[in-house]
């Protein structure tokens, strides 16, 4: 034995350790993969040895290889062996490897439970610490459930080192096993007051992370956190607590008022920028939520803005960005506080970082007023000229237009200035937003009538400029502006000073290089301009001038007829024929101007974006009907379609001759020159530039005219926007002087009347009058259509039915018939118990349709009251029709003689003889002074393993209940379906509010793994109760009971299928007997059908066979027999456990009879 140990020690001396492995990998760069595979083979041999030190060394090397990306899952069992070593140095290696490689899918992870429990209870704090650290990396739901109590015990350990680790790992345990949160929370709360600052920081971290998703659940800790915030000096802890308060403030308004003072003190005193930013951010959130409740908070806002200015002026780009981000939040509620720092925001436009420049641009959008609009745009225009890169320049262009056009041009006082800005923007080369500038030009010219004359003069200058035509090849380029220019000059041609000159500019040959859609607008507006000139010439008696304009049109329009664009061709051809006809009439001295101008009479106003939706569909028009009959499926797709006009000719591919090489081209050129020289009839050209082109090789001998595409710095005739800025300043100065004069006169009158005022009103944006009387044209809508009609909403919007005024008390006609629906129907006759069977098997969509129909009925009722039209008859007719259809359905289901003979068999339904007392499937869930909760659990065959829980919430208080949220602790067997992205400990919001005395229903889906046993889930309803005195946060705990009967669905079954099912021999059997039953057999069967979701297959005297089916497809068959004072139930089911539990539930129900 001693020799064996010595031999093992000698072998270990020659084993490779981690350093040797790393060194070897460095030395084998060329064949690294091969070397590592050899090392893995060696490691596998080492793991087979009994010596724990060799195994630990092997696992250490495997950990390094795992970091390089190699799979070591095959060594999971060996890692557990090293974890269980008694020596700490080996144990640490094992836990490190486990934390690197173990995950929920690791098969052997269940073997670690006892080892980890042993290490957690170890007297050595290092063994316990390494176990906690490793467990935090590979904790699974099973490990969390099994070890939760052990970790909770460690939260009270004597060593702060262990307490801190135990507190931190509890967060991972909560995530994997949410049921542990409630029992562990008291201890976690105690750790907030732990004497050790590390443990305290860990507790703050865990609770703040939990509260980040569900802040309302932690409102009760607000006093404790407030105490910590005012006493702690740890900046990291303060940041966490302040972030938590920022989330809690919207839920509890009273908390915000208390926070202002300590947060303000921290802002004044702290030098840490991170803490300063969080304080400012939270103060902003508090002031936004309390904007109506705190009348005097301007000092706090000013303090925040001043501190944010310090952040923005800092050289650190991250702090500068955060400062701008927080400033944008203040801007939404307190714009005037931010506007005073306009100079700083404009300086950020010069920053090297593009993200900071873009953030500053977003701020400028909200800082605009009538006073500073021109100044801000002027600054942005200078940045447009200096901007590097098309992306940022295009962003600047977009922002300039957004700033000026916001709120329907609210801040523009001089539209001539805005038109000049748009014209200056047309000089940008390479922009992709030409269509945006064009849209603005069109919009301003159409909406603002007073500016049309000036706009036309500027557009005519644009049409005459060469630089726009030069950029016609770029898609969405600046040439798009010509689209707007041509339309404006054509539509408002009466304002043109030189219409003939503009007409010639629009008919230039170079216009044909523009994109097709711009050429089409040119052609259409050329004829408008022609009609205007024609009218002017005829009124002046210049017949020759009118004929000359017509001749110009006839000469220039053919170039558009030859266009490759189909629309340009069509428009040009049509207009050319019209002009030729006019030319013939002019030759006969017939006046034609009036008729031509009548073609374009009237104004084209802008159409509202939603106008098309408002157009009513004519009666008799079915937009969903087929125009042509659809092709039958039998027709083969590969059938060749017949030619519509003539038989198609067989097209043969044209063989193009291969291109000649350079020698062949030179030989042909020389031969051609020789032939031309010897030809006496060939006219030789004189020496000219054309000669040079003929001497050039290839096809370049064709003469090409050199075009000067240089762009002038300033387009002639275009006014600069700076001139309008000066004119606007002078106009405002004169306006101010006139106001001062009027104010002095008023003051003198007041002195005479012995009246005094403490202060003079300051000039505001509203005092600045616009330069022109602006008449903004509104968008056109169809007759009797309003912009705010409810038709604007998407009819397929799933949230449309929830758009209800919840604060308004419910009228009698609007109350939901949730509980009344079943009570009234069941109280009339036992016949209503049968439709309950149908209701269980219906899809949830039916409820939505009913709700939508009720909404439509309400709208119709309102219209009926307004128009006083006799619509109630129609509604009554509809109800009678529904009742008739219901009656037909019942008659189909029930044989006509079923009620007469009690001894005859009754199939597929509940027996119907005696009247039953009213019953409801809704059971009480929980109640307090604020709310009452009742629920009904419904299964569906369409959704396997899922049940729908319908919860009715009734407000029993005088407060408005809002912000309601349902939290249910999932079990291993039942899980609540939550919205996508939510975790298991997140609550599900209730999609409505409850005014006093109102009830409503919410539905939730649960997924059930095994339905053979009943189970209970704990849940909490949290809500805010708001009344005149304020708002309080309340909660109501409940237990959701899933009985086995709730997993059954009433399913009809015929006697033949029922008999085959019993004969199959696949069903387990069980039975019960209940004594002391005096209820009639009819009522007894109705109770079983109603409460346990069975249907009657066949009944003979006091014996009946019944059937039901579970959501997972289990068949349940019953034979119910009634004696004099007892009832026996024999059952068969495909699952014996499910059957025994069902019979126990049935026994409890029958015992109450």
From Swiss-Prot:
InterPro entries: AP3_complex_dsu, AP3D_dom_metazoa, ARM-like, ARM-type_fold, Clathrin/coatomer_adapt-like_N. Present in all adult tissues examined with the highest levels in skeletal muscle, heart, pancreas and testis. HEAT repeats lie at residues 34-71, 77-114, 142-179, 180-216, 254-292, 299-336, 338-373, 375-409, 431-468, 497-535, 548-585. This is AP-3 complex subunit delta-1. Residues 659-679, 725-756, 845-869 form a coiled coil. It is a peripheral membrane protein. Residues 777-794 have a biased composition (Acidic residues). Residues 629-696, 726-920 are annotated as: Disordered. AP-3 associates with the BLOC-1 complex. Adaptor protein complex 3 (AP-3) is a heterotetramer composed of two large adaptins (delta-type subunit AP3D1 and beta-type subunit AP3B1 or AP3B2), a medium adaptin (mu-type subunit AP3M1 or AP3M2) and a small adaptin (sigma-type subunit APS1 or AP3S2). Interacts with SLC30A2. Interacts with CLN3 (via dileucine motif); this interaction facilitates lysosomal targeting. The modification Phosphothreonine is found at residue 762. Residues 639-675, 726-740, 795-839 have a biased composition (Basic and acidic residues). The gene is AP3D1. One of its GO terms (biological process) is synaptic vesicle recycling. Transmembrane segments: none annotated. Part of the AP-3 complex, an adaptor-related complex which is not clathrin-associated. The complex is associated with the Golgi region as well as more peripheral structures. It facilitates the budding of vesicles from the Golgi membrane and may be directly involved in trafficking to lysosomes. Involved in process of CD8+ T-cell and NK cell degranulation. In concert with the BLOC-1 complex, AP-3 is required to target cargos into vesicles assembled at cell bodies for delivery into neurites and nerve terminals. SMART domains: BLVR. Pfam families: Adaptin_N (PF01602), AP3D1 (PF06375). Residues 741-758, 840-853, 863-879 have a biased composition (Basic residues). Gene3D superfamilies: Leucine-rich Repeat Variant, Longin domain. It comes from Homo sapiens (Human). One of its GO terms (cellular component) is glutamatergic synapse. Keywords: Acetylation, Albinism, Coiled coil, Cytoplasm, Golgi apparatus, Hermansky-Pudlak syndrome, Membrane, Phosphoprotein, Protein transport, Repeat, Transport. SUPFAM superfamilies: ARM repeat (SSF48371). The keyword Protein transport applies.
């Amino acid at each position: 034995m001693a020799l064996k140990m010595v031999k093992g020690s000698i072998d270990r001396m020659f084993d490779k350790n981690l350093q040797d492995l790393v060194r070897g990998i460095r030395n084998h760069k060329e064949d690294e993969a091969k070397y590592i595979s050899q090392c893995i083979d060696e490691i596998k041999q080492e793991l087979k040895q009994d010596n724990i030190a060799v195994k630990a060394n092997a696992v250490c090397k495997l950990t390094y290889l795992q970091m390089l990306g190699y799979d070591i899952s095959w060594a999971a069992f060996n890692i557990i062996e090293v974890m269980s070593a008694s020596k700490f140095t080996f144990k640490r290696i094992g836990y490190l490897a486990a934390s690197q490689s173990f995950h929920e899918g690791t098969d052997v992870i269940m073997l670690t439970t006892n080892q980890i429990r042993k290490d957690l209870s170890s007297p050595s704090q290092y063994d316990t610490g390494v176990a906690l650290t490793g467990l935090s990396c590979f904790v699974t739901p099973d490990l969390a459930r099994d070890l939760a109590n052990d970790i909770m015990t460690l939260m009270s350990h004597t060593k702060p080192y262990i307490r801190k680790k135990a507190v931190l790992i509890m967060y991972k345990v909560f995530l994997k096993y949410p049921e542990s949160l409630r029992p562990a929370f008291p201890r976690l709360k105690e750790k907030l007051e732990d004497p050790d600052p590390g443990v305290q920081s860990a507790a703050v971290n865990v609770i703040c992370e939990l509260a980040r998703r569900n802040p309302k659940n932690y409102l009760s800790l607000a006093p404790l956190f407030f105490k910590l915030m005012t006493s702690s000096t740890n900046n990291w802890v303060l940041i966490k607590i302040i972030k938590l308060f920022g989330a809690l403030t919207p839920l509890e308004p009273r908390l915000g008022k208390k926070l202002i003072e300590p947060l303000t003190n921290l802002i004044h005193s702290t030098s840490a920028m991170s803490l300063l930013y969080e304080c400012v951010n939270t103060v902003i959130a508090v002031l936004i939520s309390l904007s109506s409740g705190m009348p005097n908070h301007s000092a706090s806002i000013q303090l925040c803005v001043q501190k944010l200015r310090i952040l923005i002026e800092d050289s650190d780009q991250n702090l500068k960005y955060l400062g701008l981000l927080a400033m944008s939040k203040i801007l939404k509620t307190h714009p005037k506080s931010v506007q005073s720092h306009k100079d700083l925001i404009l300086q950020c436009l010069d920053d090297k970082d593009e993200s900071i420049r873009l953030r500053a641009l977003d701020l400028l959008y909200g800082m605009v007023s009538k006073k500073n609009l021109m100044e801000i745009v002027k600054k942005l225009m200078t940045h447009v000229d200096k901007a590097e890169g098309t992306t940022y320049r295009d962003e600047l262009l977009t922002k300039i237009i957004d700033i000026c056009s916001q709120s329907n041009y609210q801040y523009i006082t001089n539209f001539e200035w805005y038109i000049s800005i748009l014209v200056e923007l047309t000089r940008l080369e390479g922009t992709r937003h030409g269509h945006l500038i064009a849209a603005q030009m069109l919009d301003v010219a159409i909406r603002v009538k007073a500016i049309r004359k000036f706009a036309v003069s500027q557009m005519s200058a644009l049409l005459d400029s060469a630089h726009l035509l030069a950029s016609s090849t770029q898609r969405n380029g600046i040439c798009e502006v010509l689209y707007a220019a041509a339309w404006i000059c054509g539509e408002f041609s009466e304002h043109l000073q030189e219409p003939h000159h503009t007409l010639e500019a629009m008919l230039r040959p170079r216009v044909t290089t523009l994109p097709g859609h711009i050429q089409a607008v040119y052609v259409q507006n050329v004829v408008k301009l022609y009609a205007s000139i024609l009218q002017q010439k005829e009124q002046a008696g210049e017949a020759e001038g009118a004929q000359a304009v017509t001749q110009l049109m006839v000469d220039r329009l053919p170039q558009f007829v030859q266009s490759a664009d189909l629309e340009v061709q069509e428009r040009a051809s049509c207009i050319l024929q019209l002009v030729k006809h006019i030319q013939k009439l002019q030759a006969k001295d017939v006046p034609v101007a009036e008729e031509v101008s009548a073609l374009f009479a009237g104004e084209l106003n802008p159409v509202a974006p939603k106008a098309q939706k408002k157009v009513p569909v004519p009666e008799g028009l079915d937009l969903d009907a087929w125009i042509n009959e659809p092709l039958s499926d039998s027709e083969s797709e590969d059938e060749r379609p017949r030619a519509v006009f003539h038989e198609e000719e067989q097209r043969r591919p044209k063989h193009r001759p291969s291109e000649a090489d350079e020698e062949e081209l030179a030989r042909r050129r020389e031969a051609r020159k020789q032939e031309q020289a010897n030809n006496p009839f060939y006219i030789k050209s004189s020496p000219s530039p054309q000669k040079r082109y003929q001497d050039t090789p290839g096809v370049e001998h064709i003469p090409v005219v050199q075009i000067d595409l240089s762009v002038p710095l300033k387009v002639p005739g275009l006014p600069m926007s700076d001139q309008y800025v000066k004119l606007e300043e002078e106009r405002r100065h004169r306006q101010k002087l006139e106001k001062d004069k009027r104010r002095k006169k008023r003051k003198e009158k007041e002195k005479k009347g012995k009246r005094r005022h403490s202060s003079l009103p300051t000039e505001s944006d509203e005092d600045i009058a616009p330069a022109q009387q602006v008449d903004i044209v509104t968008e056109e809508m169809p007759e009797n259509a309003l912009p705010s009609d409810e038709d604007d909403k998407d009819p397929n919007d799933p949230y449309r039915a929830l758009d209800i005024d919840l604060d308004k008390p419910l009228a009698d006609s609007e109350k939901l018939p949730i509980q009344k629906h079943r009570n009234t129907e069941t109280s009339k006759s036992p016949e209503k118990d049968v439709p309950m069977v149908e209701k269980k098997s219906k899809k949830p969509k039916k409820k939505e349709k009913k709700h939508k129909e009720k909404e439509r009925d309400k709208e119709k009722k309102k219209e009926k009251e307004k128009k006083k039209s006799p619509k109630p008859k129609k509604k009554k007719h509809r109800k009678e029709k529904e009742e008739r259809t219901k009656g037909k359905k019942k008659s189909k289901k029930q044989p006509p003689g079923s009620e007469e003979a009690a001894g005859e068999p009754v199939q597929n339904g509940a027996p119907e003889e005696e009247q039953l007392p009213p019953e409801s499937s809704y059971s009480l869930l929980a109640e307090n002074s604020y709310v009452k909760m009742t629920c009904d659990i419904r299964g569906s065959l369409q959704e396997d393993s899922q049940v729908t829980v319908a919860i009715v919430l009734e407000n029993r208080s005088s407060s408005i209940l809002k912000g309601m949220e349902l939290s249910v602790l999932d079990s291993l067997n039942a899980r609540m379906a939550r919205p996508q992205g939510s975790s298991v400990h997140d609550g599900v919001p209730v999609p409505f509010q409850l005014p006093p005395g109102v009830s409503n229903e919410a539905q939730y889906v649960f997924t059930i793994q095994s339905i053979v046993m009943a189970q209970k889930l704990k849940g909490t309803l949290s809500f805010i109760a708001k009344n005149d005195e304020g708002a309080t946060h309340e909660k109501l705990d409940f237990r959701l009971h899933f009985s086995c009967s709730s997993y059954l669905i009433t399913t009809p079954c015929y006697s033949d299928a029922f008999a085959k099912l019993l004969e199959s021999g696949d069903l387990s059997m069980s039975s019960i007997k209940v004594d002391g039953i005096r209820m009639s057999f009819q009522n007894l069967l109705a109770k079983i059908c109603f409460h346990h979701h069975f249907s009657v297959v066949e009944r003979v005297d006091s014996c009946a066979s019944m059937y039901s089916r579970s959501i997972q497809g289990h068949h349940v068959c019953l034979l119910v027999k009634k004696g004099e004072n007892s009832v026996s139930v024999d059952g068969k089911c495909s699952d014996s456990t499910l059957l025994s539990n069902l019979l126990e539930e049935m026994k409890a129900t029958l015992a109450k009879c």
